[in-house]
């Protein structure tokens, strides 16, 4: 990278997001970095959840009926897939293909050559978060139209594409 800002743009439990500039073509990008050691922490937490679920299923009929162990296994599969930035890159690329030629949604480019299991690099897009209502109102943004388009995007993903990608920002 030509330039890398060490102050995160955003931080969540699994990853942090930074801004940078590519060395090759000077494009502004965002870099999503999986937190070091988070996989081991998650695996430890899942192990504890599994032990609690197994215990509860032996002691309580409702826990057995709710299939808590199965629920933990499903959660494990989902959360571990969220740790792989290559899978997220692939999902973003698929979403971009699904919305090609559609002006409802702009999906940023992913720079696959820079991506790895713990790193996602994608085009920097400037925008205003939808929760900044005062700013959007000041700019005259039609919030009803934004909501309608959000629903349309969701419905297209679910019922037309049969592919839903919810993490639309790094």
Outline where the language-model segments fall.
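Conserved catalytic cores of large enzyme domains
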Residues: 1-170
């Amino acid at each position: 990278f030509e330039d890398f800002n060490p102050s995160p743009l955003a931080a969540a439990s699994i990853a942090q997001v930074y801004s940078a500039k590519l060395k090759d073509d000077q494009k502004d990008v965002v870099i999503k970095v999986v937190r070091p050691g988070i996989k081991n922490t998650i695996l430890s937490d899942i192990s504890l959840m599994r032990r609690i679920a197994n215990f509860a299923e032996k002691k309580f009929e409702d826990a057995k009926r709710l299939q808590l162990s199965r629920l933990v296994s499903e959660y494990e599969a989902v959360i571990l897939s969220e740790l792989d930035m290559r899978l997220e890159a692939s999902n973003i690329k698929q979403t971009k293909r699904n919305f090609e030629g559609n002006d409802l949604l702009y999906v940023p480019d992913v720079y696959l050559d820079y991506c790895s299991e713990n790193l996602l690099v994608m085009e920097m897009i400037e925008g205003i978060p939808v929760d900044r209502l005062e700013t959007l109102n000041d700019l005259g943004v039609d919030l009803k139209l934004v909501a309608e388009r959000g629903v349309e995007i969701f419905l297209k993903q679910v019922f037309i594409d049969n592919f839903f990608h919810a993490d639309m920002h790094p």
